[in-house]
Amino acid sequence: MAAKEVRFGDAARSAVITGVNVLADAVKVTLGPKGRNVVLERSYGAPTITKDGVSVAKEIELKDKFENMGAQMVKEVASKTSDTAGDGTTTATVLAQAIVKEGMRYVAAGMNPMDLKRGIEKAVSAAVEELKKLSKPCSTSKEIAQVGSISANSDAEIGRIIAEAMDKVGKEGVITVEDGSGLENELDVVEGMQFDRGYLSPYFVSSAEKQIAALENPFILLHDKKISNIRDLLPILEQVAKAGKPLLIIAEDVDGEALATLVVNNIRGILKTCAVKAPGFGDRRKAMLEDIAILTGGTVIAEEVGLSLEKAKLEDLGQAKRVEVGKENTTIIDGAGDTKAIEARVTQIRKQIEEATSDYDREKLQERVAKLAGGVALIKVGAATEMEMKEKKARVEDAFHATRAAVEEGIVPGGGVALLRTIDAVSKAKGDNHDQDSGIKIVLRALEEPLRQIVTNCGDEASVVVNKVKEGKGNFGYNAATGEYGDLVAMGVLDPTKVTRSALQNASSVAGLILTTDAMVAELPKEDSPGAGAGMGGMGGMGGMDM
């Protein structure tokens, strides 16, 4: 086991503060509409230029292990805020630094760190309650666009495209962000349910130009097993042929004689069909087949429920207005399922999301909700260079998460004003003793810090602006983008309540831990023994053996 160095008291805390300050100072320059860029070195290729706080935080690793511990603790604030709210990472970092800086002065003055921490917690609880009162629902497309714009560093185009995407697929819909091929941002919306399985044979293709099999008003057969024998399928094929409609078969697999017969019938025009594999694997496949059944008003033909292919009837089949099957995707548009049944299924999946333990499961369940409830929107980010593309894509993702958070918990005035408006409520909070009251004072000072930093990044005088905003009420604040004072909500300067709340809670949590730290343990750097190197060097003399 490697030797360790242990530091106590002030020696430990001073190293932590240095680390906190290095990371926070690098991150906070990006705050606000006039925040500066940070250039990040890459081991290969061009450097990355970003205004995204969490991207800057993730890059920072300090040489001194004790200082690095402080930096990593604040990095945790940024990451946690990004994970829960999708944005607000820079605000959280600024708040954490402010609480730690102010708190350390009180600790140095001999106050009890545990009481300071309790005071900080009381103040934050009061601020969070006040934020909830200030919050108003984010319902209109205009407000969604404004939230997106602010989060994307005042890029109105990004806000507009996110609002349009949410408009098209609903607030529950899946929105994915990927690299575009042009200079402009594009929005591609997939209506209905899409899953990542394509046709099993190219002979099913009906449009050579688009390379898709398009079925109008088809029946949809859902089966959870492999279909190889055509005799199992014949009874239902005959019923579908009599009805004069096309047929989509979704099964674990279709091969051999069954696939060959379907292809021949399709080519001859006797019965228009298409076969695709069921999406997902194992239990997820069964669940997704059930989703498709509910969406299309059909039943999954499975032995578990006492149904077999030979005895299947037309009533067991689902229906849709249109189905498009490509090489890699199948899209079911306007399924004939009962609306109430679909809503019940969505509610059931949402309960599973609440109980899900892994992020992967949660994400997959969220996708299933979106496919049933809304649709899928694809934002293709356009840019002139790869460097710009990466930076823009990160901003679009930030903006998307922020708008989701706004829809979830509502919006408050932006520009650091919401935190400033909680000061009255926080100042009424009372601690159990003098040290806890000092903890409340620490938070009161920290609540001003995001606005101060936004103003500083604009090149204006922070104290003047903070005092003027404090004199106003409600949504009155400073619009850093234009340099004007006024109603920030009317100006479109909005923050999601969830983002502001998460930033404050995460910052105070980690800052409280730092203030109550009294010892630190880190590995001593390994020293290379000079003997080994010298011995190896001596082997060079063996060259002289050749006489």
UniProtKB/Swiss-Prot annotation:
InterPro entries to which the protein is assigned, alphabetical: Chaperonin_Cpn60_CS (IPR018370), Cpn60/GroEL (IPR001844), Cpn60/GroEL/TCP-1 (IPR002423), GroEL-like_apical_dom_sf (IPR027409), GROEL-like_equatorial_sf (IPR027413), TCP-1-like_intermed_sf (IPR027410)
CDD domains the UniProt entry points to: GroEL (cd03344)
Class of enzymatic activity (EC top level): isomerase
Native species: Nitrosomonas eutropha (strain DSM 101675 / C91 / Nm57)
Protein known as: Chaperonin GroEL
Subunit architecture: Forms a cylinder of 14 subunits composed of two heptameric rings stacked back-to-back. Interacts with the co-chaperonin GroES.
Gene assigned in the entry: groEL
UniProt entry keywords in alphabetical sequence: ATP-binding, Chaperone, Cytoplasm, Isomerase, Nucleotide-binding
Annotated positions binding ATP: 30-33, 51, 87-91, 415, 479-481, 495
